[in-house]
Every structure is written in structure tokens, then in C-alpha cells.
């Protein structure tokens, strides 16, 4: 694709990056076949190729409009197009650059601005989000259906964690909304790691990974989140922690980008690369310990009936982190019978705050995904990202859990025996 960027961006780092990405696109259109919004709306401008043309026009000096902004807003950033693209177009980075420019040039209506301010004020702050969520859960039965669906039900679960007792240690990203919505998830991960001889150590000062602010075009706040985490984790990594582990693939995909996003920061560039290098999804950690894990699971699952489970692979897991088939293998080893899921590459519609900002499209995508997931009559739906988990649960009766909780449940007899001996 030939380009002629405007003076305002041509010689900037973002301009050079955007120019390189634009030139790698060959207009083939393969991306449209796997784009969820294009499949729903059938509009070229609501697919990756059309959005690339819109961004190119803006970066070449064209005046963006509210319609331009709408088409960019409708993108889920699911990155299925990147998996499909034969030319390796780094679409999500071009979208980040384009959205930031359009955000500066197009003033949003007051209602949109207030909603985004509220999201930025509450969701990245666990100390504020969790109590507000509890209040919402208390009054949830009294709310009208559409509003009630947006508030996840309170989930019972074991949130007890083992003490740090092993020489092998990892840091765990706790997240911002996950501790409030599903506190049992990280606790389950800590117990599974403990059974494998790995302790999770506390890192006070860490918080939101930065993805939420970043994708709402609050770039400065996102970078501040990232730097705070780097400062919190650096002492543990320097002292021998083996990884920064995340149980939410959306967070993990953002951690993987720390090195890239802070590459031009003289103070943090090197440390950001270290965090990205040490970033591991919990599935990757368990895969590295698969021999020991499988041996434990063989003891605890022998003779137990296999439970039918549908696995939803979040976009951030399969397209962002490029982890495919790994969780399914671990679940099978834990005694689960996986049911087939059609169109597994498509997004469920959660996409961070997308379900709040684009509720109609999000709901359609969720319902389509639930139809595919429940077609095999599973007893449970498992996933790997808190946003997907809450979003899918809001639309159906089949329980939706994080897959690590199923591993924890399968290992429970072995862990109880081990603890009784210590």
C-alpha cells in the first residue's frame, strides 16, 4: 500500500511505525473472512481492510468524522485478522495509533465522554471497583434485565491460598476487576502452582496491567500503570522469581507488549523488556511442568467420570498470545471431555469495555458464541479470561468458570493429602 503521511505525523515514531504497517498491507481481504464485526454488519468499513483505509486517510491529512470514530470504536481488537493475514500486518498497533489521532480530532458527545470517564475512574482501581460491585450485586435482583445482565452474580469459591514455602517462586498479576468478580481464580492458580512446588509471592504496589486505560485512549494513564507494575515486580524478579504469571489472557497479552510500548522510554525500556520476557500465561507455566502435573492428575482422576466441558479460547489467548491447544490438552489430562465448538476463532463480544460501550454488537456476538459453546450440551463452559467469563455468564444458564479452577478441583485430593502430611 502506497502512503503519503501528513506533516503532523510523518516524522514521529508513531508515524514511521504506521507507515511501515500500512505498506505491509496488500489489500487481499483475507482478514474480512474472520472479522466478527464484518460478519455481523457486512460493511467494508467495519472490517480490518476498511478500517485500515480509514486510518490511512486520517494519517494522510484527511479530516476524521464521528462516523470514522464509530467504525474504529466498533473494532473489538480481537486480532483474528492478524492470525489470518498472510502478510503479517500488525493491525492492532495501527489501530492504536489511528484511534489516538482520531480521539484528539473528534470530540465525543457528552454521554460518551462521561461513560468513559466513569470507566477509567472505577474499573482499574480494585479498592473502588470491588465494593461498588458488591453493592450492585446486592440490588441486582431489583434491576431491569439489561442492567442486571451487566452485573456479574457473586460467585462462591475457595479463595484460600497456601503460604509461600517453596524455593521456586513466581509473581502473579492480580488484576483490577478479577479480584472482585472471581477471587477464586487466582487462589486456584496459587494452589495448583503450590502442588507443583512453586510459590506465589506477594508484590504490593502492583495493580491494573494498563490494558483498560490503553484501549480507552488514556495512554498516559496506561503507561503510568505499566511503570508502577514494573517497579513493584522488579525486586522479585531480581531476587529469582521465575515469571510474572497472569490468569487473565487479556492482561497477559498486554504484559507481552510492555517492552514494545515502553521501548522509547529511557528509564523503563530495559525493565519493560524484562517484564515482557518473564510474562507467562498460567497455561504456559503448567505446560512447562506437564510431566509432574500429569502424574498428579493420573492419581486423582483415575476412575472418576469424565465431565463434559466446552472451552472458549479468548481472542487474547489464541490471537494475542498465540497459545492454541494447550489449555485443551491440560483439561483433557484433568479428566474433562471437551465438546466441539464451531467457529472457535470468533470473539465472544466481551473485549474489555466493549460490552459496555457497544452493547448491541457485544450482545449479538455473545449469543452467537453461547450457541456454539452449548451445542454439545456441556455441563460447564471454561475460559481463560475474566472478561469473557463474566460476559458469557451474563447470557446463559450454563456455569462459566476459569479453566484453572477445574485443574485445581481435579488436584484437590492430592493437595489435601500433601497438606495433611506437612
Residue spans of the language-model regions?
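Iron-sulfur cluster-binding electron-transfer modules in prokaryotic oxidoreductases
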Residues: 14-15, 91-422
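Short His/Asp/Glu-rich catalytic/ion-coordination signatures at enzyme active sites or charged loops
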Residues: 60, 80, 84, 217
Amino acid at each position: 500500500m502506497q502512503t503519503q503521511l501528513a506533516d503532523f505525523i510523518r516524522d514521529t515514531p508513531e508515524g514511521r511505525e504506521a507507515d511501515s504497517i500500512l505498506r505491509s498491507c496488500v489489500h487481499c481481504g483475507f482478514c474480512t473472512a474472520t472479522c466478527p464485526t464484518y460478519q455481523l454488519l457486512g460493511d467494508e468499513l467495519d472490517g480490518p481492510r476498511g478500517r485500515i483505509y480509514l486510518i490511512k486517510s486520517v494519517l494522510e491529512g484527511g479530516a476524521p468524522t464521528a462516523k470514522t470514530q464509530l467504525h474504529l470504536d466498533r473494532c473489538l481488537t480481537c486480532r483474528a485478522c492478524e492470525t489470518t493475514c498472510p502478510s503479517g500486518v500488525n493491525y492492532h498497533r495501527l489501530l492504536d495509533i489511528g484511534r489516538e489521532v482520531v480521539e484528539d480530532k473528534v470530540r465525543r458527545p457528552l454521554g460518551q465522554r462521561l461513560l468513559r470517564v466513569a470507566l477509567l475512574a472505577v474499573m482499574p482501581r480494585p479498592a473502588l471497583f470491588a465494593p461498588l460491585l458488591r453493592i450492585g450485586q446486592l440490588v441486582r435482583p431489583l434491576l431491569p434485565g439489561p442492567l442486571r445482565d451487566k452485573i456479574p452474580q457473586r460467585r462462591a469459591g475457595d479463595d484460600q491460598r497456601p503460604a509461600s514455602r517453596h524455593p521456586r517462586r513466581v509473581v502473579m498479576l492480580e488484576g483490577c476487576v478479577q479480584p472482585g468478580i472471581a477471587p477464586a481464580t487466582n487462589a486456584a492458580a496459587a494452589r495448583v502452582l503450590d502442588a507443583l512446588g512453586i510459590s506465589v509471592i506477594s508484590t504490593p504496589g502492583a495493580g491494573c496491567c494498563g490494558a483498560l486505560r490503553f484501549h480507552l485512549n488514556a495512554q498516559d494513564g496506561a503507561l503510568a500503570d505499566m511503570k508502577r507494575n514494573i517497579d513493584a515486580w522488579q525486586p522479585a524478579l531480581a531476587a529469582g522469581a521465575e515469571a510474572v504469571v497472569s490468569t487473565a489472557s487479556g492482561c497477559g497479552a498486554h504484559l507481552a507488549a510492555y517492552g514494545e510500548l515502553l521501548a522509547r522510554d529511557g528509564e523503563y525500556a530495559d525493565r519493560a523488556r524484562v517484564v515482557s520476557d518473564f510474562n507467562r500465561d498460567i497455561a504456559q507455566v503448567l505446560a512447562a511442568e506437564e510431566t509432574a502435573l500429569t502424574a498428579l492428575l493420573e492419581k486423582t482422576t483415575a476412575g472418576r467420570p469424565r465431565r463434559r466441558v466446552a472451552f472458549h479460547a479468548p481472542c487474547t489467548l489464541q490471537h494475542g498470545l498465540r497459545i492454541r491447544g494447550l489449555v485443551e490438552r491440560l483439561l483433557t489430562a484433568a479428566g474433562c471431555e471437551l465438546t466441539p465448538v464451531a467457529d472457535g476463532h470468533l470473539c465472544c463480544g466481551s473485549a474489555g469495555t466493549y460490552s459496555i460501550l457497544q452493547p448491541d454488537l457485544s450482545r449479538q456476538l455473545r449469543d452467537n458464541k453461547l450457541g456454539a459453546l452449548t451445542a454439545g450440551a456441556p455441563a460447564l463452559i471454561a475460559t481463560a479470561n475474566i472478561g469473557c467469563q463474566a460476559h458469557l455468564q451474563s447470557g446463559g444458564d450454563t456455569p462459566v468458570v476459569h479453566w484453572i479452577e477445574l485443574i485445581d478441583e481435579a488436584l484437590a485430593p492430592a493437595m489435601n493429602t500433601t497438606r495433611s502430611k506437612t
